[in-house]
A protein has these predicted regions:
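Flavin (FAD/FMN)-binding glycine-rich loop and adjacent Rossmann-like elements that form
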Residues: 4-263
């Protein structure tokens, strides 16, 4: 089961993988402290920095230290972030940290931010998009936003279409009320494969569907479904695609998974 997020094992095994010519930027997530947003004179701070300082400063999500209010989190973009090689991942991490360091230094020059400090940051740059498998079925954006329930659906996804196009604009399309996307087992199986599955960001899907499928909860659901399919296939001596879908769903349900409508 390839859970690399980059379809690395699928590629090494000789299965076809797909990638966009231009991929979405990555993000380095961090938290700031040492200032009070409500006391800042925003007229003296360039507008482009307001988002970083304001991020998630809602009354019900404030986190209080003994001295200052911490921003729950914010992020900087890392264009071209790539985690498919050690070299690329290192470059993305270094670029993210350099961008963040320059930002912190700049923010500290503004009135009210003299004591601003970096509280913490993620250990690595988060990568949104690399390779996807060419699976038995490629989920598309309409499948996702319509909440189509596939006959071989094994898990759900909830996130909106969320394509970070160039680091400056985001295309989003939220699911309508009572619509929940489902993920078919076929999208976890590479074409021409026998005893192989994937789970996570490298699921077989078009770019827009993948922009929603890539998040953690969806990946966890795919991982559990792929594991169950693999166990049943191994016990029965057949390929994952040949396992009865109701057996997969029953075992998932036994272990507490939230599964799409029973066939």
């Amino acid at each position: 089961i390839d859970c690399t997020g980059n379809a690395l094992i699928a590629s090494m095994a000789g299965y076809d993988v797909l990638r966009e010519e231009d991929t979405q930027p990555g993000s380095l997530i961090f938290r700031l402290g040492g200032y009070k947003y409500d006391e800042l004179d925003l007229t003296k701070i360039p507008k482009k920095h307001h988002r970083i300082l304001r991020q998630n400063m809602l009354e019900n999500s404030k986190r209080e230290s003994r001295e200052h209010t911490y921003v729950p989190y914010s992020y900087v973009y890392v264009p071209g972030a790539d985690s498919t090689t050690s070299e690329g991942h290192t470059i993305a991490n270094n670029e993210g940290r350099n961008t963040l360091l320059n930002l912190v230094r700049k923010l500290k020059t503004f009135p009210g931010c003299e004591n601003l400090k970096l509280v913490d940051l993620k250990t690595e740059t988060a990568v949104r998009e690399t390779y996807r498998i060419d699976g038995l079925y490629k989920m598309n954006k309409d499948d996702y936003t319509s909440g189509k329930v596939f006959d071989d659906a094994v898990s759900h996804s909830f996130y909106p279409i969320d394509l970070h196009r160039d680091g400056k604009s985001i295309y989003q399309e939220f699911l309508k009320p009572d619509i929940v996307a489902s993920i078919p087992l076929r999208s976890l199986i590479p074409k021409r494969s026998q005893n192989f599955l994937v789970a996570g960001r490298c699921v077989s899907s078009d770019r827009l569907a993948n922009s929603a499928l890539r998040v953690q909860a969806s990946c966890m659901g795919m991982g559990q479904a792929a594991a169950v399919a693999a166990v049943l296939a191994s016990k029965q001596g057949i390929s994952p695609a040949e396992v009865d879908i109701n057996e997969i769903k029953n075992l998932l349900k036994k272990h507490g998974a939230i599964i799409p409508k029973q066939v």
